[in-house]
UniProtKB/Swiss-Prot annotation:
Alphabetized UniProt keyword annotations: Isomerase, tRNA processing
Signal peptide segment: none
Record-listed substrate binding positions: H42, Y75, Y178, L199
Listed name of the protein: tRNA pseudouridine synthase B
GO molecular function: RNA binding; tRNA pseudouridine(55) synthase activity
Cross-referenced InterPro entries: PsdUridine_synth_cat_dom_sf (IPR020103), PsdUridine_synth_N (IPR002501), PUA-like_sf (IPR015947), PUA_sf (IPR036974), tRNA_psdUridine_synth_TruB (IPR014780), tRNA_sdUridine_synth_fam1_C (IPR015240), TruB_C (IPR032819)
Lineage of producing organism: Bacteria, Pseudomonadati, Pseudomonadota, Gammaproteobacteria, Enterobacterales
Gene assigned in the entry: truB
Source organism per UniProt: Photorhabdus laumondii subsp. laumondii (strain DSM 15139 / CIP 105565 / TT01)
Length: 315
């Protein structure tokens, strides 16, 4: 007897509006249970303090989550000036308090230093791993690990307001950028210290923020399904974006079914309409319905060579 698969073969991306004070993994597990999905993964953790867009990939969509990890992000952040904490946010312990003695001109000049391409040393309170363990585990033991500065890009850093000891900013940045570290570094540059008291992720890649869904909305739909004695999927599956939405910007190669059959077996195939760029990544679809079947690269021979394939569900 074959092993019974747990959960549904449901595939797609849910844009979860993560609530405050739960971990990204806890939020992921709640979504997985509500959808009764056999497989799920998120695309870039948010701190427990943070709220906002957390794309949750279900089923075969998990194969393409790396492209969301690599994408740009946009955040709204409120910092408290005059206090520095060990975690660079309000969940940590205050380690210094200093007077706020600066002008708008000084603030603007300091903010400008964080725009564009810079190098950032990640916080000890991050999920980056050192010798197989997250840095935050070392930090909780009082162990400081040397970290290398990493290149980041801040495409846009917009000043929103400065009132008393609160500074509000909107930041559009590259992958791997730690907003807490930007705020901590800014506080040190200003000479007063700073830490994050509010953080919301507004956008990941080009996903529309009006498609975000809260856990409360999911629970309400789950309750409605139970009351109506219908499968919960009838009410919530329509909330999912297509599994290839993370790579919608890739050039498309459409294969006729007879050629697609070879591609789905892992073979490189020829397409009359392949993009000219060798080694370019493409999104592969099948037939007139343009069903997404995987991603590929165009190899030196001009063939469409599979890189990741969608495994079709078998009843």
């Amino acid at each position: 007897m074959g092993r019974h698969r747990r959960g549904r073969d449901i595939h797609g991306v849910l844009l979860l509006d993560k609530p405050q004070d739960i971990s990204s993994n806890d939020a992921l597990q709640k979504v997985k249970r509500i959808f009764n999905a056999s497989k799920a993964g998120h695309t870039g953790a948010l701190d427990p303090l943070a709220t906002g867009m957390l794309p949750v990939c279900l089923g075969e969509a998990t194969k393409f989550s790396q492209f969301l990890l690599d994408s740009d992000k946009r955040y709204r952040v409120i910092a408290r000036l005059g206090q520095r904490t060990d975690t660079s946010d309000s969940h940590g312990q205050i380690i210094s308090e200093r007077a706020i003695q600066l002008s708008q001109v000084q603030l603007d000049a300091a903010l400008d230093k964080f725009r564009g391409d810079t190098m950032q040393i990640p916080s000890m309170y991050s999920a980056l791993k050192y010798q197989g363990k997250p840095l935050y585990e070392y930090a909780r033991q009082g162990i400081e690990v040397e970290r290398e500065a990493r290149p980041i890009t801040v495409y846009e850093l917009q000043f929103i307001r400065w009132e008393n000891d609160e500074l509000e900013l909107e930041i559009h940045c590259s992958k791997g950028t730690y907003i807490r570290t930007i705020i901590d570094d800014l506080g040190e540059l200003l000479g007063c210290g700073a830490h994050v008291i509010y953080l919301r992720r507004l956008q990941v890649a080009n996903y529309p923020n009006d498609r975000m869904v809260t856990l409360e909305q999911l629970y309400e739909l789950q309750k409605q399904a139970k009351d109506q004695e219908i499968p919960v999927g009838e009410l919530i599956d329509s909330l999912l974006l297509p599994m290839d939405s993370a790579i919608a910007h890739f050039p498309e190669v459409n294969l006729i079914p007879v050629v697609a059959a070879y591609f789905k077996q892992g073979q490189a195939v020829r397409s009359a309409k392949s993009p000219a760029l060798v080694e370019s990544m493409v999104r592969v679809t099948e037939g007139d319905e343009r069903k997404f079947i995987g991603i590929a690269v165009i190899n030196d021979d001009g063939l469409v060579a599979p890189r990741r394939l969608v495994v079709e569900s078998r009843d």
